[in-house]
Amino acid sequence: MQLIRGRSNVSQCLSSCVLTIGNFDGVHLGHQAILRHLRQKADELNLPMAVMLFEPQPREYFLGDKAPARLMRLRDKLYYLKQAGVDVVIIAKFDRTFANLPAQQFIEDWLVRKLNVKFLSIGDDFKFGAKRQGNFALLQQAGEKFGFTVEDSRSFCLDELRISSTAIREALANDDLKLAEKLLGRPYRILGRVIHGNELGRT
């Protein structure tokens, strides 16, 4: 899996793609279903399958310490995206410049010129661009103008509960590990590096 950081490196590494955009925090069952469908589209079109992430996540940029805790670190997210068959991950730096980027400019600069997207899978509630003025309808209009297909990635439910990173956080907050694991599609793990101390407790 190829990792591309920053706008300036995209065109050098990628000539065209099928794309989805999001946080993919937890890479849960809903994310996995989206990625399986995108993999099929990529194979049909004979194009690489790409995921665009933002660092920091938009909520972290706007809310700071009040933003929801992540379900996993970026390193672990990249591991699970690779396991899902993703060919390319683009990490866009979410800073003041990006936050103030007009929605139409994001479409033309990123989706059209840089990525040359042919198929875009996105939630119908996706908002983007300065003041969140960009939406699903604007992307559909752009697709007709610039020649790419836009598809609603839809929500997925398990036992009538919408699968989402928020639902998993709530399950963990309520000590309901079984529900969190069902929504994730695997056991919940906190991964980290072991730091060895001075071993003063040894006899």
Predicted regions and their residues:
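Short acidic-hydrophobic, aromatic-tinged amphipathic segments that line or gate anion-handling sites
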Residues: 2-9
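Conserved beta-strand termini and adjacent loop/short-helix elements that scaffold enzyme active sites
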Residues: 6, 52-54, 92-94, 153-155, ...
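A short acidic, often aromatic-flanked loop/helix-cap motif at beta-alpha or helix-coil junctions
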Residues: 9-12, 96-99, 156-161
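N-terminal catalytic cores of NTP/NDP-binding nucleotidyl/phosphoryl-transfer enzymes
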Residues: 11-73
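Residue-level detector of anion-binding/catalytic polar loops
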Residues: 48, 87, 149
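N-terminal Rossmann-like or analogous alpha/beta NTP/dinucleotide-binding catalytic cores
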Residues: 60-124, 128-146
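Active-site cores that bind ATP or allylic diphosphates and position pyrophosphate for catalysis
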Residues: 108, 112-203
